[in-house]
Amino acid sequence: MREILPGIFTWGSTYADRPWDLNGYAIRLDGCTVLVDPPAPAEDDWPSFDVIKPITKIVLTNRDHIRDVEVFRARFGAHLVAGADEVKQLAPITIDEAVREGDLIAGALHVIHLPGKSAGEMGLYFDPAYHAISREMGGILLLGDAIIGNPPGALSLIPELKLDDSPRLKRSLRKLLDYDFDVLLLCDGQAVLSGGKRKVAEFLNTLA
């Protein structure tokens, strides 16, 4: 696990059937840490998670990012958070907190509902009003499967066969341009640490 930005840590797993890394994030907030889409860490990474306790919430951005969430929940006793429209699709996983567009997770992470890949796909905007690092960095946006960083240095959508409704997803993504952000953190593929909004705008202009 490494600190990608002050108070924001990442680690990843590689799978033979995907040409990109699957990334998890640990976000330190006032008095707690929130995990997002956590994959299995390397065995020698576990002590790093103990350092950033208490881990109070684990966020799933979509139904396909269950990954190692139950291992983390059992180890740290964290509440599991997911989009309200994703809860049924996540069964038999039990969701402790269902969130909707505009909700704040842990008082700082603003929920952006991005339906299309799946009904409850969501992104997280690090609200600059409540998150000092986001304010200093020009805004931070985190996405699950709505956009991926593949190939490295570029943005793309996941394969069409994995999308519930491709036209709806493309419409949903337009709302990202309503937010001010420079950093784009991605749970699939390579993050963009500078010029993130410009890169998203350029990518959206390529979509039919």
Task: Annotate each PLM feature.
Residues 1-3, 26:
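Short, exposed beta-strand/loop patches in secreted or surface proteins that constitute
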Residues 6-9, 15-17, 32-35, 41-42, ...:
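Metallo-beta-lactamase
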Residues 19-21, 93, 99, 118:
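Residues that act as N-cap/strand-start positions at coil-to-secondary-structure junctions
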Residues 23-25, 101-103, 122:
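Residue-level detector of beta-strand structural context in well-folded domains
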Residues 40-107:
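Active-site HxH/HxHxD metal-binding segment of metal-dependent hydrolases
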Residues 58-62, 114, 187:
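Ser/Thr-glycine-rich phosphate-binding loops at phosphate-binding pockets of nucleotides
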